[in-house]
């Protein structure tokens, strides 16, 4: 009888733990959805390829460029090209998983060009553009000038490279962003992560927080892994070996954003 009562009490405690964990998880993910959703931030969004970024430079917000880019499929364009001769449509970043624009009969790979125009205050200031990894090679033009390149998007001399990059430049009144992208093999061709535009200091603060969190988690996992290895040599328990293996897997996952912050790497399978 005592064993049955103990078993029932144990099962009840288990179910209570599972339910509480699920509730806390839902609350945590909901907070992330509300606070870290780059598609629902409060600043102005682009409409038909044009963003009005008004206000003084000191109070200039960070703009998540998620909406209505002009996208030119199957075209690796430069500022010298006459864009009126090419077909384009408006897309949101991440709207499609590749460059086929939802057409299952087409290949998701190839080349494409993204264009966005931003209206700015009349005074000249330094602005920043943060580009999370773009698959898998691109040229970045700002007001007709090549300000950055990752890999080589030329299909005949294609070199894939990805990295989280920050570019700064001076501008006033307006500017045009043109990103020419080529991808031949990755799982998510083109621009899938939302670019960020604004005051360089504010953007670097956001980047710094992300790097700090990733570095802290990475360090914590290394410490837990070291403790698991130490515990194995003390106890020779297989559970410690399995836990160390899990730590190694999580370590590999956690180091990915850190590597792509500091190094330009090939696309990993």
Predicted features and spans:
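Aromatic-lined ligand-binding clefts that engage carbohydrates, nucleic acids, or primary amines
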Residues: 118-142, 177-179
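Hydrophobic alpha-helical transmembrane segments of multi-pass membrane proteins
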Residues: 32-36, 215-231, 238-265
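Extended carbohydrate-recognition surfaces in non-catalytic/accessory domains of CAZymes
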Residues: 8-122
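Short, Lys/Arg-rich, polar N-terminal cytosolic tail immediately upstream
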Residues: 1-7
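Membrane-interface interhelical loops and short amphipathic "cap" helices
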Residues: 198-206, 260-269
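An acidic-aromatic loop/edge-strand motif
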Residues: 159-216
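Solvent-exposed beta-strand/loop surfaces of large extracellular or lumenal domains
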Residues: 86-94, 145-163
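Intrinsic-disorder/low-complexity, polar/charged segments enriched in Ser/Thr/Lys/Arg/Asp/Glu/Gln
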Residues: 64, 111-117, 126-128, 164-166, ...
């Amino acid at each position: 009888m005592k064993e049955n009562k103990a078993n029932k009490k144990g099962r009840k405690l288990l179910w209570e733990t599972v339910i509480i964990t699920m509730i806390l998880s839902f609350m945590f993910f909901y907070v992330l959805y509300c606070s870290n959703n780059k598609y629902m931030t409060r600043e102005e969004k682009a409409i038909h390829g044009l963003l009005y970024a008004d206000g003084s430079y000191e109070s200039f917000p960070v703009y998540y460029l998620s909406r209505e880019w002009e996208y030119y499929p199957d075209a690796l364009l430069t500022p010298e090209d006459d864009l009126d001769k090419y077909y384009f449509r408006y897309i949101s970043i991440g709207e499609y998983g590749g460059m086929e624009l939802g057409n299952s009969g087409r290949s998701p790979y190839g080349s494409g060009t993204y264009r966005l125009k931003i209206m700015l205050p009349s005074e000249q200031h330094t602005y920043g553009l943060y580009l999370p990894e773009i698959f898998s090679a691109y040229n970045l033009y700002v007001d007709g000038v090549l300000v950055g390149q990752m890999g080589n998007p030329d299909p005949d001399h294609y070199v894939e490279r990805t990295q989280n990059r920050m570019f700064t430049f001076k501008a006033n009144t307006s500017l045009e962003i043109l990103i020419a992208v080529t991808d031949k093999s990755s799982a998510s061709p083109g621009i899938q992560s939302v670019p960020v535009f604004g005051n360089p200091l504010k953007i670097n603060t956001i980047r710094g927080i992300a790097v700090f969190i990733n570095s802290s988690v990475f360090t914590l996992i290394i410490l837990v892994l070291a403790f698991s290895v130490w515990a194995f040599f003390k106890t020779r328990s297989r559970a410690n070996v399995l836990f160390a293996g899990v730590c190694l897997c999580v370590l590999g996952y956690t180091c990915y954003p850190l590597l792509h912050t500091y190094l330009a790497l090939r696309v990993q399978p």
